[in-house]
């Protein structure tokens, strides 16, 4: 049995998101680079009210996943597969060796600025739970919205103008769906951000990239990324294309992953996977008091499943 590492997307930032790595020497280069990029101390940035703004959130999320990895890489077995949810896919590439941490952070900032520039005003994302994909697509078609992320059989993130999302929410709730607003202010992974795709592809082409050294699954099609060209395509195309997260998790399982560890803030990805794959062991780093506790759990989980 083998290990999958997951890097989260936006929404779970919180003031204590760097507490487990605050005094970790191995994480210091990542934290210092993030502070320099943001123009303020990374710990202060995590507590600030603007931590959900794209230009703050995306570097913070990459930094959190990479800092956790720096503290765990010497004590964990080599992952069988790595995947990232939205901006988490960029962090996943840094873990897989496609880019270094500094390049990852710089690209995250460029990504955020390009998404903001391409985004229409008064738009964003919300979660729709309790209806299947066909019903969700019908709701989107009826109200001018789009499926941004397919997280599970009846769990979707939809994007669009807020007016469209409010109308969709009322319609969906009348059919028994649950709606959860998200603190994301751009309609990521929808055609509304098509204007950001080519500029971000150009930024990726100009960066120092290489093929991943570890197996990594792309969010848009759940296929392994094996070369530089595919990396550029999948990371740029996802800005305006649906993330097929449920398919990514299915492929991770099919590739032998039975222990899943979410890096970074929160445990949203772990909570998605656990009920869908009850035969697997699934946790998030932030469910433990320390990185040592998370590493000990990984080793014990792998032993239990042998």
Residue spans of the language-model regions?
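Helix-rich "cap/lid" substructures immediately adjacent to catalytic or cofactor-binding pockets
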Residues: 1-83, 158
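Short glycine-aspartate micro-motif
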Residues: 4-5, 82-84, 104, 260-262
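Conserved small-residue
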Residues: 7-9, 34, 65, 88, ...
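Alpha/beta catalytic cores of group-transfer enzymes, especially the acyltransferase/condensing modules
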Residues: 10-11, 95-239
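Short beta-strand
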Residues: 44-45, 84, 146-151
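Flexible, low-complexity segments
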Residues: 64-82, 239-306
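Gly/Ala-rich beta-loop-alpha elbow adjacent to hydrolase catalytic centers
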Residues: 65, 80, 84-88, 92, ...
């Amino acid at each position: 049995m083998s290990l999958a590492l997951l890097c989260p997307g936006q929404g779970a930032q919180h003031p204590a998101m760097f507490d487990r790595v605050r005094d970790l020497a191995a994480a210091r280069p990542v934290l210092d680079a993030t502070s320099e990029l943001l123009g303020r101390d990374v710990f202060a940035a995590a507590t600030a009210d603007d931590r959900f703004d794209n230009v703050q959130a995306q570097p913070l999320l990459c930094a959190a996943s990479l800092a956790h990895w720096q503290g765990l890489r010497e004590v964990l077995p080599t992952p069988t597969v790595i995947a990232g949810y939205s901006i988490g896919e960029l962090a996943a590439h840094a873990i897989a060796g496609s880019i270094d941490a500094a390049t990852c952070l710089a690209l995250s900032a460029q990504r955020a600025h390009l998404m903001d520039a391409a985004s229409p005003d008064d738009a964003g994302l919300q979660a729709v739970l309790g209806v299947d994909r066909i019903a969700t697509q019908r709701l989107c078609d009826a109200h001018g919205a789009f499926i941004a992320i397919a997280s599970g059989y009846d769990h979707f993130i939809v994007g669009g103008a807020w007016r469209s999302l409010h109308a969709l929410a009322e319609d969906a709730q009348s059919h028994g769906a649950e709606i959860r607003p998200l603190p994301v202010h751009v309609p990521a992974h929808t055609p509304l951000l098509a204007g950001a795709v080519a500029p971000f592809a150009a930024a990726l082409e100009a960066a120092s990239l290489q093929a991943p050294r570890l197996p990594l699954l792309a969010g848009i099609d759940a296929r392994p990324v094996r070369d530089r060209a595919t990396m550029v395509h999948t990371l740029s195309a996802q800005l305006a294309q649906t993330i097929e997260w449920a398919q990514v998790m299915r492929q991770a399982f099919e590739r032998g992953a039975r222990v899943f560890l979410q890096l970074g803030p929160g445990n949203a990805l772990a909570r998605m996977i656990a009920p869908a794959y009850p035969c697997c062991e699934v946790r998030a780093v932030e469910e433990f008091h320390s990185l040592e506790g998370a590493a000990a759990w990984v080793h014990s989980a792998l032993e239990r499943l042998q």
